[in-house]
Regions:
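Short, low-complexity N-terminal intrinsically disordered segments enriched in polar/charged residues
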Residues: 1-7
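Residue-level detector of functional hotspots within protein domains
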Residues: 2, 53, 70-72
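A short linear-motif detector with a strong N-terminal bias
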Residues: 3, 42-47, 64-67, 79-82, ...
Length: 119
């Protein structure tokens, strides 16, 4: 059950931004798992369950971001993302359906809806 993000979450994210390397991350992996990954997974699954309950005829796809950056796109940045997010969209097609999202970083959180349609 999602109980919220903590001060430890913000502190971990801030420290990750300042120490974005594998040795630091491995030393702090337990904090990541406890204060960021687990709450994000719980929140995403609870929001998804509510969407399924409210819209039983419209299956949704849930995507939870990974902490690891794509190694092909580092461009001088560290190997870990400095934000974590999840999104969900109707699985029938992108056309006409919105994507809901939530994201968190060291200083803020974002929530919203995005609509995309071919021109």
């Amino acid at each position: 059950m999602f109980t919220g993000f903590s001060q430890e979450t913000s502190e971990f994210m801030m420290n990750l931004a300042l120490n974005n390397d594998r040795p630091w991350f491995e030393r702090h992996r337990e904090i990541y798992e406890r204060s960021l990954k687990k709450p994000m997974d719980e929140l995403a699954k609870e929001v998804m369950a509510e969407m399924v309950r409210r819209f039983p005829d419209d299956p949704f796809e849930l995507h939870i971001s990974r902490i690891y950056r794509d190694a092909r796109r580092l461009f001088g940045r560290g190997p870990y993302k400095e934000e974590l997010w999840f999104s969900m969209k109707p699985s029938r097609s992108m056309e006409g359906g919105g994507t809901l999202f939530f994201g968190i970083d060291a200083l803020s959180w974002q929530v919203g809806c995005d609509f995309w349609r071919d021109p």
